[in-house]
Every structure is written in structure tokens, then in C-alpha cells.
């Protein structure tokens, strides 16, 4: 394989990666969420959602309702949490802006999420903490992501296969 063919393959790989990145960012713009697709990592929402389910989020609604399943991030913790809204109330700021505050709980958990929230915080702020509301899901499809994340040999094997296929594919 000459240098020109190698450059073409490298450009094809760059095109695939940039297309995936543009798709992700475009989906984020449409859904108004930094993380429009997430994978369930625990059993806290069983039986509604199982470990490995892929969730599709929507974050364009001004408020969420009691009973909605939301994905939120806690300040200082990297992994988003998927739980159901248990309680909500609205607070008007000094500048007359209405903020929605939420209390959540996993369906399979005995207590609410108060202990998970940021230090000295009794509620989630809808605008600051919530990534989106779950609108659809695909069962079990996210297990591939979990396998790659939790198993370093699976990650190395997948990267090796990708590199090998790139080197062996001819145009």
C-alpha cells in the first residue's frame, strides 16, 4: 500500500469520526441537551429501565412534571443519574424569574435522592442540574458501552480491531 492510499484511508477515518461528532452535536442542539443519549448504569430505576438501556432525552420543555423520568448531573460528580421526579415546587427570584426545584427518587430505591445532591442542596434546579427528560429508550443496546467502559481488555480489543480493519481495508 503506497502513501497515497494510506492518506486516503486516514482521511476516510477522519471523515467518519467528524461525521459522528457533528451528528452528536446536532442532536444536542435539537434536544437542547449536552448529553442527548445516555446509558443506564445501575438498577435504581428497575423495572422501568434496566442496566444497559439507552435513553433518549429531550430538554426543550420549560418545566418537568411529577412522575417524569429525568437525567441530572450533580456538581462535582461525572456520572449522570436517571431518576423519577417525586416532588416539585416553583420559586420566584428577586428578578421575577420562576425556577423549578425538583426532588427525585429511583423507582427501585427505598428513599429519595436528597443524599445524592450537591452539598447543602435540598432540591435539583431544573435549569442548572437537569440534562433532560426521558422520551424514548432502547432496551439492552447500551451494554456494549458498559462493556467497553468497565473492561479494559474489551476496550483494547475494540481499538485493535478498528486499527486492524483500517490498515487492511483497501480502496
UniProtKB/Swiss-Prot annotation:
Coiled coil: none annotated. One of its GO terms (cellular component) is signal peptidase complex. The chain crosses the membrane at residues 7-24. This is Signal peptidase complex catalytic subunit SEC11. Catalytic component of the signal peptidase complex (SPC) which catalyzes the cleavage of N-terminal signal sequences from nascent proteins as they are translocated into the lumen of the endoplasmic reticulum. Specifically cleaves N-terminal signal peptides that contain a hydrophobic alpha-helix (h-region) shorter than 18-20 amino acids. Residues 157-168 are annotated as: C-terminal short (CTS) helix. The keyword Endoplasmic reticulum applies. It comes from the Eukaryota. Residues 25-171 are lumenal. PROSITE patterns: SPASE_I_1, SPASE_I_3. CDD domains: S26_SPase_I.
